Each structure stands twice: as C-alpha cells, then as structure tokens.
Amino acid sequence: ETARRQGYSGARWPKMTSPSGAESPSSVGPFLVWQQPHPIYYAELVRRERADRATLERFRDVVHDTAEFMASFASWDDAGQRYVLGPVLQGAQEIFPKDRTVNTAFEVAYWRWGLETAQRWRERLGLDRERRWQRVLDRLAGLAVRDGMYLFAESAPESFTDPRWA
C-alpha cells in the first residue's frame, strides 16, 4: 500500500514499526531505502538452510514484491543513460541532504545484490528473469570513486575531505 500511495509498484518496507506493525513516525524514515532488500536477504538465508521448493514458494511473493518496488524506485537518468537512486534519498548515514543525494554506495550495492538475488529466485522457480528488473540491473549506476576510494554517495565527492561527513 505504501509503495502504491507513493507512485511505485511492489512492496515498500518501513525503516521501523510500532509493536502493532504500523510504520513509526520518523523525520527521515520516508526517505530511507537501505532497508528495502532486507526481506530478500532474510528469505535467501532461509533458502540456504532449506533449499527446497516449499521455501521458494513460501517467500516467493515477498521476494517478488520487494524487487518490484526496488526496480520501480530506480529512476532513469537520460544524461547518463543509466538508472539512479535518488534524489529524493536519505542515505543510511542520515547526514546528506535528501533533496540532493544520489547513488549512495551502500544502497546501490545492496540494490544490485537484491535485484540479482530476486532474479535467481525466479530462475529457481522455473521462471524467466523479469525484464524490467534486468534493465535496471544492467544499467544501474556504479559506485562512485574518487582518488581510489568509494564515496559515500555520488553526490558527495568530498566524502573524505569535508569535516561535516567525518
């Protein structure tokens, strides 16, 4: 429901919830996406312990709906001919301006892992790879690098020199 209300498809997971399962109030929560691949990760851990058809079927919809949101959240950057994450995006560090933050390292790496893992789930279920997810995977921005170091975010070239980010 949250994803649909925000103009995306699939399932968007909150950063934190109340004991009843409702999304907890947060000034940054709606802008965070680092937690999105978690359900795919958890399902994959269960699959590694119980690599059978029943496990694949049990978590099929969670994996699919999570990946569906992830693919719909990535936006096409015409200038760079690639998919990007953000803006609006609050990185896991919660220190960068959400209205200018793009391609945070943790999120880009986890996005790639999550979508690829969801594609492998489809294959294990005897399904073809999802074309839209694959387009995002094939054209997702890489990790930003400066002076041989991965930046916190592509939009933060001063990741290691600006004292605000230390």
Feature-to-residue mapping (PLM):
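Active-site core of glycosidic bond-cleaving carbohydrate-active enzymes
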Residues: 1, 32-41, 45-49, 57, ...
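Helix-terminus loop motifs that line ligand-binding clefts
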Residues: 1-41, 47-58, 62, 66, ...
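Carbohydrate-binding/catalytic loop surfaces
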Residues: 3-28, 81-106, 149-165
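Acidic/histidine-rich catalytic neighborhood
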Residues: 65, 69-124
